[in-house]
Amino acid sequence: MNWSDDGIVLGGRRFGEGGLILDVLTREKGRRSGLVYGGASRRKRAQFEAGNTIALSWTGRLDDQLGRFDVAEARKDRASRLLDDPAALAALSAITSLLRGGLNEGDAAGSSLYEATTLLLDQLTEPNVWPALYVRWELGLLSALGFGLDLDECAVSGANDGLTHVSPRTGRAVRGSEAEPYVDRLFALPSFLIDPRADVLPGDIAAGLRLTGYFIEGRLFGSVHRGLPPERERLLKRITPPA
């Protein structure tokens, strides 16, 4: 069997003498792994940095077995452009670790995340853009994997205006007036997550990351008895203003 596709590099690990088992998110096949002969060599190492997009071909006997990747060319080198931006590098590490931890090999949901992930990665050089986009991407990750939040209407009244909080129990939005008696037990819902025209206010990114992180940890990683990847924890600490 064989196929060709573009893939976002999620990571890799050494195998044997100079080999590399490469982990990628492909446009059509979702998350896939394959062996790249000589992939750990100094000459080839740079193109396999996490976050880069490469054109590759996969060959194997059976689709569910580890096959071989032949890399045709590097489509986009992103990692090297972020070397002087620790926050963007932290976001890149969080993105790839969440995809590696949240997607199974060949998971069809991976294909639905390819374009959104490409868009986010391409914006990591724009510090005024990517933080809000990143939080929206995490919401999309939850939705694509069947753990989406319901932010369309109030869980109590059914109203679709004035939504200010999210219930940690149900993942549903709550209107401000209904949320008031329980506000200390709810997550704040930043306006930019329900209205794309809303300004991103101070504290909104941190609030958004706490919201999505809770459900990613509890619903996605909790289902397999794992916590959030440490890369995701480091991102929250890096972009959360000190108290």
Swiss-Prot record:
Record keywords, A-Z: DNA damage, DNA recombination, DNA repair
SUPFAM superfamilies to which the protein is assigned, alphabetical: ArfGap/RecO-like zinc finger (SSF57863), Nucleic acid-binding proteins (SSF50249)
Pfam families with a match to the protein in the record: RecO_C, RecO_N
Disulphides: none
GO BP terms, alphabetized: DNA recombination; double-strand break repair
Gene3D superfamilies, per the entry: Nucleic acid-binding proteins, Recombination protein O, C-terminal domain
Transmembrane segments: none
InterPro entries in alphabetical order: ARFGAP/RecO (IPR037278), DNA_rep/recomb_RecO_N (IPR022572), NA-bd_OB-fold (IPR012340), RecO (IPR003717), RecO_C (IPR042242)
Cellular component annotations (GO), alphabetically ordered: bacterial nucleoid
HAMAP family named among the record's database cross-references: RecO (MF_00201)
Family listed: Belongs to the RecO family.
Job description of the protein: Involved in DNA repair and RecF pathway recombination.
Name of the protein: DNA repair protein RecO
Gene behind this protein: recO
